[in-house]
Amino acid sequence: MIWHVQNENFILDSTRIFMKAFHLLLFHGSFILPECILIFGLILLLMIDSTSDQKDIPWLYFISSTSLVMSITALLFRWKEEPMISFSGNFQTNNFNEIFQFLILLCSTLCIPLSVEYIECTEMAITEFLLFVLTATLGGMFLCGANDSITIFVAPECFSLCSYLLSGYTKRDVRSNEATTKYLLMGGASSSILVHGFSWLYGSSGGEIELQEIVNGLINTQMYNSPGISIALIFITVGIGFKLSPAPFHQWTPDVYEGSPTPVVAFLSVTSKVAASASATRIFDIPFYFSSNEWHLLLEILAILSMILGNLVAITQTSMKRMLAYSSIGQIGYVIIGIIVGDSNDGYASMITYMLFYISMNLGTFARIVSFGLRTGTDNIRDYAGLYTKDPFLALSSALCLLSLGGLPPLAGFFGKLHLFWCGWQAGLYFLVSIGLLTSVVSIYYYLKIIKLLMTGRNQEITPHVRNYRRSPLRSNNSIELSMIVCVIASTIPGISMNPIIAIAQDTLF
């Protein structure tokens, strides 16, 4: 009898929860239509995985890619609509958030074809891999639109949990297990620090959790210049710092890049930075409105350390993935310049434009690493010597992406950095921009060193890995080449049409 009563209560409670969720989706679903499309795609993947004995692999890739493309389409149709706040103030939809959501969806869409051949060769579980990628994408999108401290904490946890699982996906690889352990420990510590900072904001504002209400609460309690706000700023900066991985919060980055599966590294290297940048701009710009001088100083220190340490240490690396890890630390220093400049002098527009170019440059380089690694089994920079003699397309596309990362004209990376530095110069960040220019010159050195190895034709310098290199038939690697071609085009041609791209970003944001 007691069991029946408990069972009935459980059913009633479950029904109430379901009806409440259905009510929220019914009245707020249009605000999160792109996210709902991804959720529907996740459900489809789970249904196919649980009902089909023999997995129809092309269908799994098709459903994942289609849900991402449909989500992008839904975002584009909603472009330039009036800002909306939904779910009792927890989620905000506006042009600024949607641009970052578009960038995250673009990253995921390019990463799936980049992963196809790698998954087939390493015999990784396909469905789970795609589920984790889509769920991480969903978490990143919710983080971009988060409008309160609870959602800002929960959404990155959704992203981070999937990231931990993806980084340790090759369970038999000792390096992958080591990378996952370090990533998990650092991620857990950063989340604890972040939520501690939010608790100081919560108390100082009189119990408010919405970003704008926190500002109003600080005004009402007269706590906006209190030591508690300074403590909150330090803890939140440290917490976000571990997500963005600028120096000195970069310790996990090289090991995770080196030990994780290469398609996973490609995915994490761009999506995590886009989502964390979107969150950082909103957190610093709204709740810490009265502490702008303090957080500007903190971010300037992080940017300087990142640009110097990232680019100098990258010179000494022998692993291609570790080199890109330190390069990404330097790149986030450039992005921080745009965050500091903010709305004034088109800082956000230049930051978003540079991140768009960075996605194509970085993913194009990782596509080369995936393709070369599958055919040679090595990641050592020296082993790339003479690749042009065996695979001219791979060598040339790699060279273009690396030159664009270094910021050489007339490629997209040059114009992206130029506009970002110009906005910083107009905002009076002379020392920061000077450091950025000097470290960009340093980065060109180690990128050109790799390109020289790729293009060498001396037999004595060509390693056995390249001598035994065999190109696979087009049918087997066309998915990687598709991603690479898209990334190479996006790393070169947009630089010529820089003004229209900046104009679109400015028109959309303001």
UniProtKB/Swiss-Prot annotation:
<feature type="transmembrane region" description="Helical">
    <location>
        <begin position="24"/>
        <end position="44"/>
    </location>
</feature>
<keyword id="KW-0874">Quinone</keyword>
<comment type="function">
    <text>NDH shuttles electrons from NAD(P)H:plastoquinone, via FMN and iron-sulfur (Fe-S) centers, to quinones in the photosynthetic chain and possibly in a chloroplast respiratory chain. The immediate electron acceptor for the enzyme in this species is believed to be plastoquinone. Couples the redox reaction to proton translocation, and thus conserves the redox energy in a proton gradient.</text>
</comment>
<comment type="subunit">
    <text>NDH is composed of at least 16 different subunits, 5 of which are encoded in the nucleus.</text>
</comment>
<dbReference type="GO" id="GO:0009535">
    <property type="term" value="C:chloroplast thylakoid membrane"/>
</dbReference>
<feature type="transmembrane region" description="Helical">
    <location>
        <begin position="124"/>
        <end position="144"/>
    </location>
</feature>
<dbReference type="InterPro" id="IPR045693">
    <property type="entry name" value="Ndh2_N"/>
</dbReference>
<feature type="transmembrane region" description="Helical">
    <location>
        <begin position="323"/>
        <end position="343"/>
    </location>
</feature>
<protein>
    <recommendedName>
        <fullName>NAD(P)H-quinone oxidoreductase subunit 2 A, chloroplastic</fullName>
        <ecNumber>7.1.1.-</ecNumber>
    </recommendedName>
</protein>
<keyword id="KW-1133">Transmembrane helix</keyword>
<keyword id="KW-0813">Transport</keyword>
<dbReference type="GO" id="GO:0008137">
    <property type="term" value="F:NADH dehydrogenase (ubiquinone) activity"/>
</dbReference>
<feature type="transmembrane region" description="Helical">
    <location>
        <begin position="183"/>
        <end position="203"/>
    </location>
</feature>
<feature type="transmembrane region" description="Helical">
    <location>
        <begin position="484"/>
        <end position="504"/>
    </location>
</feature>
<keyword id="KW-0934">Plastid</keyword>
<keyword id="KW-0521">NADP</keyword>
<keyword id="KW-1278">Translocase</keyword>
<keyword id="KW-0618">Plastoquinone</keyword>
<keyword id="KW-0793">Thylakoid</keyword>
<keyword id="KW-0150">Chloroplast</keyword>
<dbReference type="InterPro" id="IPR001750">
    <property type="entry name" value="ND/Mrp_TM"/>
</dbReference>
<dbReference type="InterPro" id="IPR010096">
    <property type="entry name" value="NADH-Q_OxRdtase_suN/2"/>
</dbReference>
<dbReference type="Pfam" id="PF19530">
    <property type="entry name" value="Ndh2_N"/>
</dbReference>
<feature type="transmembrane region" description="Helical">
    <location>
        <begin position="99"/>
        <end position="119"/>
    </location>
</feature>
<feature type="transmembrane region" description="Helical">
    <location>
        <begin position="418"/>
        <end position="438"/>
    </location>
</feature>
<dbReference type="GO" id="GO:0019684">
    <property type="term" value="P:photosynthesis, light reaction"/>
</dbReference>
<feature type="transmembrane region" description="Helical">
    <location>
        <begin position="57"/>
        <end position="77"/>
    </location>
</feature>
<dbReference type="Pfam" id="PF00361">
    <property type="entry name" value="Proton_antipo_M"/>
</dbReference>
<keyword id="KW-0520">NAD</keyword>
<feature type="transmembrane region" description="Helical">
    <location>
        <begin position="229"/>
        <end position="249"/>
    </location>
</feature>
<keyword id="KW-0812">Transmembrane</keyword>
<keyword id="KW-0472">Membrane</keyword>
<feature type="transmembrane region" description="Helical">
    <location>
        <begin position="347"/>
        <end position="367"/>
    </location>
</feature>
<dbReference type="GO" id="GO:0048038">
    <property type="term" value="F:quinone binding"/>
</dbReference>
<dbReference type="GO" id="GO:0042773">
    <property type="term" value="P:ATP synthesis coupled electron transport"/>
</dbReference>
<feature type="transmembrane region" description="Helical">
    <location>
        <begin position="295"/>
        <end position="315"/>
    </location>
</feature>
<feature type="transmembrane region" description="Helical">
    <location>
        <begin position="395"/>
        <end position="415"/>
    </location>
</feature>
<feature type="transmembrane region" description="Helical">
    <location>
        <begin position="150"/>
        <end position="170"/>
    </location>
</feature>
<comment type="similarity">
    <text>Belongs to the complex I subunit 2 family.</text>
</comment>
